[in-house]
Every structure is written in C-alpha cells, then in structure tokens.
C-alpha cells in the first residue's frame, strides 16, 4: 500500500514538472515567433495579369495544359470508343469470328 502511494505521488510530480516545462517552452517559442520578422510579406498591390483570375475554377486551364501527353491520347481513344454506334461490336474478339 505504501508503494502505491509513493508511485502515485511520483506520477503526480512528474506530470506537474512536465506541464511546467511544456508551458515554459511554449512561452519561449511564442516570444521567439513574435519577435522574428516575417519571411514573406504579402503585398497590397496585385499583379494586373492575375487580378481577373481569382477563382480556382478560372485557373483550371493551366492544370489541363500540365497534363502528360498520354492523357490526351487516352482521352481521344476513350472518346472514339464511346462514339461507336450501338450496332457494332468495336474491339470485341467475337466480332472477328464471322466464319464460325
């Protein structure tokens, strides 16, 4: 019973010490963060080229131009496969066996 009391007392002392050291380190880092000058300053004046493009959807044309070339090929192939009429079989192997 005495050992459990000693252990619980030791735990509470460790918790108190760790919370004090955490509070001290947080305060130290907060004071350093406040005193450090910002690395990047936002300018109040924007570029005249980017001012009409405020919406990310409006910038989607840039993303499409960055797609790899195989995506354009795959897109064209998919479009051509989808445009096949419903009466043809397209690339199915069963369509090649006309003599059976």
UniProtKB/Swiss-Prot annotation:
Compartments in which it is found: Mitochondrion
GO cellular component, one term: mitochondrion
GO biological processes: karyogamy; polar nucleus fusion
Phenotype when the gene is knocked out: Failure of fusion of the polar nuclei during megagametogenesis.
Protein keywords: Developmental protein, Karyogamy, Mitochondrion, Transit peptide
Main subcellular location: mitochondrion
Chain segments annotated as coiled-coil in the UniProt record: none
Span of chain positions assigned to the transit peptide in the UniProt entry: 1-29
Purpose: Required for karyogamy during female gametophyte development, when the two polar nuclei fuse to form the diploid central cell nucleus.
Designated name of the protein: Protein NUCLEAR FUSION DEFECTIVE 6, mitochondrial
Organism, as annotated: Arabidopsis thaliana
Name of the gene encoding the protein in the UniProt record: NFD6
């Amino acid at each position: 019973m005495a050992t459990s009391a000693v252990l619980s007392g030791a735990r509470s002392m460790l918790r108190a010490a760790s919370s004090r050291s955490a509070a001290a380190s947080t305060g130290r880092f907060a004071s350093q963060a406040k005193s450090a000058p910002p690395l990047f300053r936002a300018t109040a004046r924007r570029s005249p080229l980017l001012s009409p493009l405020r919406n990310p959807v409006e910038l989607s044309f840039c993303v499409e131009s960055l797609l790899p070339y195989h995506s354009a090929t795959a897109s064209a192939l998919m479009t051509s496969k989808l445009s096949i009429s419903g009466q043809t079989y397209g690339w199915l192997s069963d369509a090649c066996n006309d003599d059976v």
